[in-house]
């Protein structure tokens, strides 16, 4: 399993999500585990323009954004929000 960091803003969102929507919280937790254990990071879509160093994964109508440092094999989970709001 890769090393990872969940940024403070995302951590707050996940704590709030756990209280409000337990099912979605479990889906996010499972998706984070999937990202950490996958062999080919190229499987996840790269973002473009200002967010070009990030990758994304969809969870229903929500998006989890993360950055992968290939040299250190380290993942930074950055943000999670509805797909209409995440890129603004």
Question: Residue locations for each model-derived region?
Answer:
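A broad, structural micro-motif
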Residues: 4-5, 42
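A short, surface-exposed loop/turn module that caps and links secondary-structure elements
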Residues: 33-56
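Alpha-helix N-cap/helix-start and coil->helix boundary motif
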Residues: 11, 41, 83-84
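Enriched for short, Lys/Arg-rich terminal
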Residues: 1-4, 15, 19-26, 59-63, ...
